[in-house]
Curated annotation (Swiss-Prot):
Protein location: Cytoplasm
Main location per the UniProt record: cytoplasm
The species this protein was found in: Xanthomonas campestris pv. campestris (strain ATCC 33913 / DSM 3586 / NCPPB 528 / LMG 568 / P 25)
Subunit structure: Heterooligomer composed of large and small subunits.
Protein family (similarity comment): Belongs to the XseB family.
One example of a Gene Ontology biological process annotation: DNA catabolic process
InterPro entries (UniProt xref): Exonuc_VII_S (IPR003761), Exonuc_VII_ssu_sf (IPR037004)
One annotated Gene Ontology cellular component of this protein: cytosol
Enzyme Commission identifier(s): 3.1.11.6
Zinc-finger among keywords: no
Name the UniProt record assigns to this protein: Exodeoxyribonuclease 7 small subunit
Function: Bidirectionally degrades single-stranded DNA into large acid-insoluble oligonucleotides, which are then degraded further into small acid-soluble oligonucleotides.
Domain of life (superkingdom): Bacteria
Length: 87
C-alpha cells in the first residue's frame, strides 16, 4: 500500500514556511522603519499567517488523537503543553 503524502496546500504541510514568514514579518515590523500603509499590510498578512499556523496545530493535534486511540478519538485526552512560567 502506498504511503499517503501530505497535500502540499494543507496547513500542516505549510506550517514551517508560514511560521518562518511570520517571524520575518515581526522582525521587520519591530525595526519600525515601515510606513503606516506597509505596517497595516504587514499586520494583515501576519494575522493570516497566525491563523494558518493555528489551524495547522489544531489539525496536527487531531491527527495525534486519531493515532493514539482510533476507536474513540472524541475521548482522547487533549494535549496540554507544559507551562512556560515554571508552574
Amino acid at each position: 500500500m502506498a504511503k499517503k503524502s501530505l497535500n502540499e496546500s494543507s496547513p500542516v504541510a505549510r506550517f514551517e514556511q508560514s511560521l518562518e514568514e511570520l517571524e520575518q514579518l515581526v522582525q521587520k515590523m519591530e525595526v519600525g522603519e515601515m510606513s503606516l500603509e506597509q505596517s497595516l499590510t504587514a499586520y494583515e498578512r501576519g494575522i493570516g499567517l497566525y491563523r494558518d499556523c493555528q489551524q495547522a496545530l489544531e489539525q496536527a493535534e487531531l491527527r495525534v488523537r486519531l493515532v493514539t486511540d482510533p476507536a474513540r478519538p472524541e475521548q482522547a485526552e487533549a494535549f496540554e503543553p507544559p507551562s512556560l512560567d515554571g508552574g
